[in-house]
């Protein structure tokens, strides 16, 4: 659907790029000619994704082990990227954390764990790149992955909803502040896109999966390639007049029932106990 080499030689960083939607976006960007950098906390995951990408696209993928919750690690990573490849043309803030829980059961540690990645980590990476773009007088594009419940809120994922709402506020604030400097900031608000691992934590049984699907006017979940195509367009020069926008891609779910995880009201206490996060998992 895109012209060949739409992203030719564009240097793009994807946080959380080793798995799931981040990996899907990375593959699409490489198909369109980008030079890709992915970061994450697990070296073995990044190495596996890099090996897969290198086999398909040659050596156009670089990895950085980085916990974006730590501003010192973020600064070191971004400084290394600028030193090694002269900077970036695009940033995709994709790294996230989420789990289902009744809000009254949340500890401060659980709240901080999600906000540290979703809100603070996203801001750390964006600002580390942004101050270099501004200092160098460079144009760039920032794309942040939020959620379809960013505007409405949602029960049982309150920390994620808080963090994503903050990221959307950051996106629109910087779109105005940095727009005159040639730096575009946009967001994508995905609905349900099954990914390995995360999907099982959020949708623990077939009955809940069926109930969720029934809420979506199009009657299905999203496909990772659909989101990757949207991301490729928004990060590309062809979206050069789009700034401060948040594009929802959820099959119309938010129009039918705004609070995404409200169908979890049907869970029993045993279901909640079974889903409680366990150390080491």
Regions found by a protein language model. Give the residues of each.
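Substrate-binding pocket helix/loop in short-chain dehydrogenase/reductase
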Residues: 102-115, 208, 212
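Alpha-helical segment proximal to the catalytic Tyr-Lys
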Residues: 131, 176-180, 240
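Short C-terminal tail/terminal secondary-structure segment
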Residues: 2-3, 243-281
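Short, small/polar-rich loop/turn modules that mediate ligand/substrate recognition or access, typified
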Residues: 92, 179, 184, 242-244
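The beta1-alpha1 cofactor-binding region of Rossmann-like NAD(H)/NADP(H)-dependent oxidoreductases
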Residues: 65-76, 108, 225
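Active-site helix of classical SDR
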Residues: 126, 163, 171
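Conserved glycine-rich cofactor-binding loop
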Residues: 16-20
């Amino acid at each position: 659907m895109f012209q060949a080499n739409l992203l030719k030689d564009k240097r793009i960083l994807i946080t959380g790029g080793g798995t799931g939607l981040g990996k899907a976006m990375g593959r699409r960007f490489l198909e369109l000619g980008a030079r890709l950098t992915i970061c994450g906390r697990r070296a073995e995951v990044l190495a596996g994704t890099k090996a897969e990408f290198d086999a398909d696209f040659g050596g156009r993928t670089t990895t950085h082990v980085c916990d974006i919750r730590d501003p010192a690690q973020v600064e070191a990573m971004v400084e290394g990227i600028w030193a090694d490849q002269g900077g970036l043309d695009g940033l995709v803030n994709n790294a996230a954390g989420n789990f289902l829980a009744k809000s009254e059961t949340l500890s401060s540690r659980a709240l901080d764990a999600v906000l540290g990645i979703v809100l603070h980590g996203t801001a750390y990476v964006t600002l580390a790149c942004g101050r270099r773009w501004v200092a160098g007088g460079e144009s760039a594009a920032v794309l942040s992955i939020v959620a379809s419940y960013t505007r409405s809120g949602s029960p049982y994922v309150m920390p994620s909803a808080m963090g994503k709402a903050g990221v959307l506020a950051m996106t629109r604030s910087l779109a105005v502040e940095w727009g005159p400097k040639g730096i575009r900031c946009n967001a994508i608000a995905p609905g349900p896109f099954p990914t390995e691992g995360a999907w099982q934590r959020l949708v623990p049984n077939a009955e809940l999966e069926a109930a969720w699907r029934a809420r979506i006017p199009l009657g299905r979940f999203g496909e990772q390639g659909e989101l990757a195509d949207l991301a490729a367009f928004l990060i590309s020069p062809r979206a050069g007049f789009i700034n401060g926008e948040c594009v929802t891609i959820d099959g119309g779910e938010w129009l039918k029932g705004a609070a995404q995880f409200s169908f979890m009201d049907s869970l029993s206490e045993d279901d909640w106990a079974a889903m409680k996060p366990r150390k080491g998992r």
